[in-house]
Amino acid sequence: PDSGFFANSALNLEYRQGPELPTLKYGFPDSHFICFPYETRRTGIYSAGCVKRPMETAKVLDDAAGAAMKAIQCSELTAEGKAVHPRAGDMTYPEFNMNRCTQCKRCTEECPFGAINEDEKANPLPNPTRCRRCGICMGACPERIISFKNYSVSMIGNMIKSVNVPEEDEEKPRVICLICENDALPALDMAGIKRMKWSPYVRFVPMRCLGSMNLVWIADSLSRGIDGILLMGCRHGDDYQCHFMKGSELANTRLSKVSETLDRLALESDRVKFVEVGITDYDKIPQIVDDFMKTIDEVGPNPYKGW
């Protein structure tokens, strides 16, 4: 959460979330310092030197040069209509079908980068130059009006629908794993390279960020007879590793509301599980998958299988 350290405005940014850089702890700007050491939650603004953390003069000079290079890179990519890190070069952007918008403000409130403002009627006003193409707004929208040309609710939904669901008499479970492409998917790749083994009944569906998860995917999967949904996302919390700052945390928050869907379908809550996976946790992937498969074996097949 924002520490709220800055009492006086210095930057006077015109963002819905306020005029300053969001801070995390001790008044320093919020950022994913492991992978993007100069990044802030304001696209095109990079922190350096003692603005970022305490450091000596020599280090400040090197740090300032690094931040300047990132600013040049951002200017060049933005001029070409491309996204900056972590999806550098992506030329897609969120498109809104305003005919179905209910002005719920969830997209404007949940975007970690302030890429969506509001007009006087609470309609979303996207700013593509601020957008990181994470898809968090897409996952937040209950009406599913937000999409990208190469990434949408219907596109992932069709991927899930194409997964073969074994018949009940085959006695083979089917589990879908929604996996973040930033940390969890590379960890899965490394586990595969090292020839590690896990259950063959799991099908992995990569996502830009787990924060782009829309709850309709879980409802549709379970109603089709999928036995379980496993979600693998970045670590969140005070020492978060989410490349899009809040995506993994938001996915976990949304998942806490999925119990209503499970109750409506008369299904067990154990059929849906969220797991935090770091990029170095490749050796834990087989155990994570196999433990979840044991849980699915205990609760039994989905009663909607074969309908």
Model-derived features: where do they sit?
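Residues forming the flavin
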Residues: P1-R174, L185, W198-L210, D227-L230, ...
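Redox- and metal-dependent alpha/beta enzyme cores, enriched for Fe-S-associated oxidoreductases
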Residues: E181-M196
